[in-house]
Design a protein with these regions (language model features):
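Membrane-helix interface segments
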Residues: 46-50, 75-79, 99-104, 127-129
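Aromatic-anchored segments of alpha-helical transmembrane domains
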Residues: 23, 56-65, 111-121
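Membrane-embedded alpha-helical segments that form the functional core of polytopic membrane enzymes
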Residues: 12-24
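Membrane-interface helix/loop boundary segments of multi-pass membrane proteins
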Residues: 27-55, 69, 98-102
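Interfacial helix-loop-helix junctions of multi-pass membrane proteins
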Residues: 64-76, 80
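Residue-level hotspots within the lipid-embedded alpha helices of multi-pass solute transporters
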Residues: 22-27, 59, 82-86
Length: 157
């Protein structure tokens, strides 16, 4: 007699639980970085420098993931690549939070960002200097211009 296959039922039960847990994790991270720390960094360093330093700190926060999950095969290049990207996305998420005061928008963009990196990142690939150049160009073209919006006008003046 064949054993019943419960995999569909298990996926049906655990997918919503996993999704809720994932959303909670991203919401919590954005609540801490954008909702709490961003204003502290803005008050201490001004908005432009504050968001860059916040992005650097956020990059340090991700070091364990960079070493173990994202790029264990090329840790130094991985740190450079991911740090550039994390500072860039931090600029955009900071802008988004200033404009909307909505942590949920930041959490959703964070989820989409991480999903895009997981989809494009293959275990068989090794990070190269070319990858760093491409990510740096994307950050310069798409994220850095947000530093020059009125929302990032320096509040230390």
């Amino acid at each position: 007699m064949a054993q019943p296959n419960y995999s569909g039922i298990i996926k049906f039960i655990f997918t919503p639980i996993t999704s809720l847990t994932t959303i909670y994790i991203f919401f919590s991270e954005e609540y801490a970085w954008r909702g709490f720390l961003q204003n502290i960094f803005f008050d201490k360093f001004g908005k432009k420098l504050g968001v860059i330093i916040l992005g650097m700190c956020w990059s340090l926060w991700h070091l364990p993931l960079i070493f173990t999950l994202y790029t264990p095969e090329a840790p130094i290049l991985g740190i450079i690549l991911r740090s550039i990207h994390i500072v860039g996305i931090s600029i955009f998420l900071g802008y988004l939070y200033i404009k909307t005061k909505n942590i949920w928008f930041c959490a959703i963009i964070h989820v989409l960002n991480n999903s895009a990196f997981l989809i494009t990142n293959s275990k068989e690939s090794t990070i190269t200097y070319h990858d760093i150049l491409i990510v740096s160009m994307v950050v310069l073209i798409f994220y850095v211009p947000f530093l020059f919006t009125k929302e990032y006008k320096n509040n230390l003046e």
